Amino acid sequence: MSERVLENHGEADADAAASAAEKTIKNVVLVHGAFADGSGWRKVYDRLTAQGHRVTIVQNPLTSLEDDIAATTRVLDLQEGPTILVGHSWGGTVITEAGNHPAVAGLVYVSALAPDSGENTATQYEGFAPTPNFVIDVGDDGFGFLNHDTFAIGFAADADDEDAAFLRDAQVPINMSAFATPVTHAAWHDKPTWAVIATEDQSFDQAMLTHMAERAGAEITYVSASHAVFMTQADVVSQVVHVAAERALVTAR
């Protein structure tokens, strides 16, 4: 092969790499679920920022679906350019509606709920196996915490003792009535979608998660992890988000 041909080949490779880089979405917004706050995303945040992404973490009030959508929308309004929207657990219901925001180019569900239009969160569990280790204690005011004694096994069985204790003690209670609020329009009908499903999740039946992800047309990654997959398998979660960022603009529905 001549030097000129090698030079042209090198230029083509460089052009292809530059084109791929231009199509990679930089903005990522992370949305936590119930019984948690945004601090649990720290390991995913660190990995994504190291890959050059601009990451913003929503702090949901967990007072209603509408309030959580509003909190997420405020963050999306701040993004400059296309954005990958990521939700864990209840955060999946939030991104299903908030994902209709024009800035959102792709969705990533991390062991997350994905209701269809007109459905609420509570109905997603119908017909699937119960999760006896996921125990919610509901107060007189209608807000629920995860039970202190069963938290580790139900939410973070594969986390070390320190991380499990931190997650337990950093809980944010959710207004249980939020689970009865239906989604108006499921954004996954219109946006390319990815899903990470934790196969050892004691909070959700994996069959339920798979059903929702397949219905949404998601590209699914299975990983051996608890419901705290965002913390215990941060490498896998961040890589799926990065792949979504690379591909969302070229796989738009």
What label would you give each PLM region?
Residues 21-81:
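Active-site catalytic motif of lipid deacylating hydrolases and related acyltransferases
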Residues 78-81, 244, 248:
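Glycine-rich phosphate-binding loop signature in dinucleotide/nucleotide-binding domains
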Residues 100-148, 175-182, 204-205, 212:
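Flexible "cap/lid" loop of the alpha/beta hydrolase fold
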Residues 199-231, 243-244:
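Conserved loop-alpha-helix segment in the C-terminal half of the alpha/beta-hydrolase fold
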